């Protein structure tokens, strides 16, 4: 969203994920045919690991456990949605892999998880994060899952803007293990 507003001249400055900045500058992915080569990063703010949070009762420990579950893939046009789609492509799945998908915004997904309306959601966000703490402490007793394996490593190796990331144990209430994933930087 912010990159589009800058490109349209509506914003002079904005924060974006480094992967979407890369795509805008290079005219790739959703920016194909709309290259914005004048876009510049002023600085990197923090790491934003891509996190999939799952309710405890859903028994989701890794990506393959999402099969047949209700998963929020993010609202159309969001960085959250774009990263989830790239991960799904790397894993060789589409929406039919899940029981169903939702397109909730980042501000709606934690309530849906806590209310039992979804089993999991994916989100690129720095840590610690208040909304993720809410997911960990509500009735869902959610936690971040590991995103590892050759498909994820291929995703990291194939993109200059991705790197391995770890959410250290104890970052969130009752998080007893490190969660290994991948991520970007906010620029």
Cite the ranges covered by each PLM segment.
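Pocket-lining segment of extracytoplasmic ligand-binding domains
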Residues: 18, 29, 58, 95-187
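Short beta-strand-centered segments that line the small-molecule binding cleft or hinge
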Residues: 13, 22-30, 37-46
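A glycine- and small-aliphatic-rich helix-loop capping segment at beta-alpha/alpha-beta transitions
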Residues: 31-33, 90-91
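Bilobed "Venus flytrap"/periplasmic-binding protein-like clamshell domains
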Residues: 1, 44-115
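Extracellular/periplasmic catalytic domains that process cell-envelope and extracellular macromolecules
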Residues: 7-8, 33-35, 44-46, 65, ...
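Loop/turn elements at helix/coil->beta-strand transitions in domains of secreted/extracellular proteins
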Residues: 10-12, 37-38, 68-69, 117-119, ...
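Short, solvent-exposed loop/turn and secondary-structure capping segments
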Residues: 3, 25-27, 83-85, 133
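Extracytoplasmic small-molecule ligand-binding "clamshell" domains
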Residues: 1-7, 13
């Amino acid at each position: 969203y912010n990159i589009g507003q800058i490109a349209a001249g509506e914003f002079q400055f904005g924060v974006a994920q480094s992967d979407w900045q890369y795509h805008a500058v290079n005219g790739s992915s959703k920016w194909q045919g709309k290259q914005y080569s004048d876009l510049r990063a002023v600085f990197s703010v923090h790491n934003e690991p891509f996190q999939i949070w799952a309710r405890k009762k859903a028994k989701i420990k890794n990506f393959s456990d999402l099969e047949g579950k209700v998963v929020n893939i993010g609202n159309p046009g969001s960085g959250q949605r774009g990263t989830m789609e790239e991960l799904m492509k790397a894993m060789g799945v589409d929406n039919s892999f899940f029981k169903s998908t939702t397109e909730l915004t980042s501000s709606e997904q934690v309530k849906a998880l806590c209310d039992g309306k979804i089993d999991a959601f994916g989100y690129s966000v720095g840590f610690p994060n208040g909304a993720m703490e809410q997911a960990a402490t509500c009735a869902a007793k959610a936690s971040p899952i590991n995103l590892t394996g050759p498909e994820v490593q291929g995703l990291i190796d194939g993109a200059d803007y991705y790197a391995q990331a770890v959410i250290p144990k104890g970052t969130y209430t009752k998080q007893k293990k490190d969660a290994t994933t991948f991520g970007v930087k906010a620029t």
